[in-house]
Amino acid sequence: MPTLEWIGRDKVINHHQEVPFRVLERKYSFDESGQHKEDNGSNNMIIHGDNLEALKALLPRYEGQVKCIYIDPPYNTGNEGWVYNDNVNDPKIKKWLGEVVGKEGEDLTRHDKWLCMMYPRLRLLQKLLSDDGTIFISIDDNEQANLKLICDEIFGSSRFVAQIVWQKRTSPDARKRMSNGHEYILIYANDPDNLERCINLIGLDETDAGKYKNPDNDPKGPWVSVDFTAQGFRPNQMYEITTPGGRVIGPPEGRCWKNLRDVFEQYNSEGRLWFGSDGNGVPRQKNYLSEKEGKTVWTWWTNEEVGHTQEATQELAALLERKAFDYPKPVRLIQRIIQMATSPDSIVLDSFAGSGTTAHAVLKMNMADGGNRKFIGVEMMDYAETITAERVRRVIAGYNKGKKSIEGTGGNFSYYELGEPLMLDSDHLNENVGKDKIREYVWYTETRQPLPKTASNNDYLLGSLNNTAYYFFYEPHQMTILNYEFLSTIKEKAESYIIYADRCALSDAELMRFGITFKKIPRDITKL
């Protein structure tokens, strides 16, 4: 498999492992009762901060849990006039490049910069994707080729599903000699060999449903017909049949019937064959609208089906009562993705949240089908509160679109900022983040699972997994010692024990006898 090389690659290829783990600090919650400081328990999140650090912060709760990821990263067009700088020359990105890539960063082309920015973020997104998850990435011609190569490397070329072509305009730009009317969406699935786990059929629209008719008043309802013949010669599919009008016929020349005689007899007895209005034609098989589960997804998405950029701009301006973004994505486009890639209780992540289209689409889908999908949106720019979160607030509560009142979808979310790092530069625990955050982190580094919310008689028990009990014997303001006194507090029966403490007073022989692995705080706490 080809490997893409660029200046700075060696500095960023494992950088996701060096990103400091920061805690997420909830600032407020919002629901149908409005905005408030009390935690409403919402699993919907809008996070303001560097998405590289935010993705790292999500790992303890969400590694391997996200069913659908959609991202719309900067396209690297070199245009500095957009609200979202699209040439990776944003001061925050430039500062990060200087720190990570070093002196080489001064010689980076804009393509090098873009690849340095994207690579570690994609590595963390891959960790968050569930076994049956799918990632969708919007891009245009500026970086499509580079994106495909690094995605093949990170996700695996065998997991590439398709490249969607989205018709983003309704007409050519007459000011240009050559007008670009499309963008791409790259799709990778974690289980491509069982694609039905990852990709759903999509629903029929009014145009599709309008193709179904019922000229014979079939009690099963409207239908479309398909050919009941097939190419080739198969002796057991060359039988004669008698039409309802009494004509005896065989297959057309050069063809055979589609199925064996017993299948034909079954279909005929069930009224599933159409012989034309006179009852003497070559049979066609009826496919009923009522039995249609959906339709196959095509890789060509027209603006009539899923919207266009002008629609999206007008949609957002009407919602916020001002022009806030130049090129947002239409809600219908993201709804198509959610319909393809989620079940009613899935988690949807967008780490380039922008104007909040993905959260808007999730809320609309839940309203339409009664689902309980959860959204996580991450936005590094300062408009995370004034545009991203404000849009979601209005979608939940309802808003006015001109003289028309748009009903709220209902729902809720909590707004987060990136907090302090959990580990200080001296490799000591940052006690300011609180014991609960530290416990959650330690459990995750041991098990790669979210910390269970189960009551225990021992405050130091994190939980049990695979017959191993995990204890984090930690107090911010005093030394903790693994000794017989602490062992007497352990009531959890397990085959083995992993116990964190500041010191250990037990001998190696005693640890072995009790099946204990001692881990020293903070030395043995794994860095993500």
Where are these regions (language model features)?
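Accessory, often C-terminal, charged low-complexity segments
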Residues: 1-38, 43-44, 52, 58-67, ...
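Short amphipathic alpha-helical segments at helix-loop
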Residues: 39, 106, 110, 318-322
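Catalytic cores of nucleotide-enabled group-transfer and carboxylate-activating enzymes in metabolic
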Residues: 40, 75, 88, 99-101, ...
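Cofactor-binding loops of NAD(P)H-dependent oxidoreductases
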Residues: 49
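Conserved proline-anchored active-site loop of SAM-dependent methyltransferases
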Residues: 64-82, 151, 348-363
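Aromatic- and acidic-residue-enriched carbohydrate-binding clefts of CAZyme catalytic domains
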Residues: 84-109
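Active-site-adjacent bridging/hinge elements
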Residues: 92-100, 304-313, 362
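Class I SAM-dependent transferase core
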Residues: 306-328
